UniProtKB/Swiss-Prot annotation:
Similarity comment: Belongs to the SNF7 family.
One GO term describing the cellular component: cell cortex
Pfam families: Snf7
Name the UniProt record assigns to this protein: Vacuolar protein sorting-associated protein 20
Lipid-acceptor residues (N-myristoyl glycine): 2
Amino acid sequence: MGVNSSKINDKDRSILSIKEQRDKLLRYSKRLEKIEQLEIDIARKCLRDSDKRGALRALKAKKLYSGLITQTYGQLGNIEQLLSTIEFTLIQKDVMFGLQEGTNLIRQLQADMPLERVGRICNDRDEAMSYVDEVNDMLQGRMSRDQEDEIQEELDSLIREQEDEKVKDLEKPGFTPSTGVDVLPSVPLKNAIPSLDESFPKAASVSNTSSAVVIDEELRKDPVLG
């Protein structure tokens, strides 16, 4: 009975160790996904600031995280499968192999980016930008031509996305693009110039009066009519 109890305890400890590694990998993958999204946000901001090189560097770092995330979830799938199909006779072989694989992956992830660094990157933009530079240096010569092309395609996609947003802004109701020309308001004239119709009768009246005076004087001078 003591032997059976010892075997059961060994089995339980092995399964518990696998579950602990599964949980660690799951937490790590979630943090990597946050940083992956952060790199995309950094790339978008760089494009808004017309910094195409900075955007490209951020997308290269994002590519690295995407690979780590894929690798992590692959190992998580293996561990889940191992936990669901584990049997007592396979403990010494399969469980120890799973433990070793999980341990190796965790060591690799922690060597690339310690957990403490992950927390700082998530909370500090300056730290994130600094890490982007480090990753960019680390990636020199490690990416294939296909990976470089994929990164360039993603950069072009972000550029098109921002251009589409600008077009949508122009199409919004009530949007008036600036012309750079100031339009002066109309000002009513206080002392308007009188029209010809208003001034003409007065001039005619003066002219008629002057003519009557001249005719009367001529009549007085004429001895026949006077």
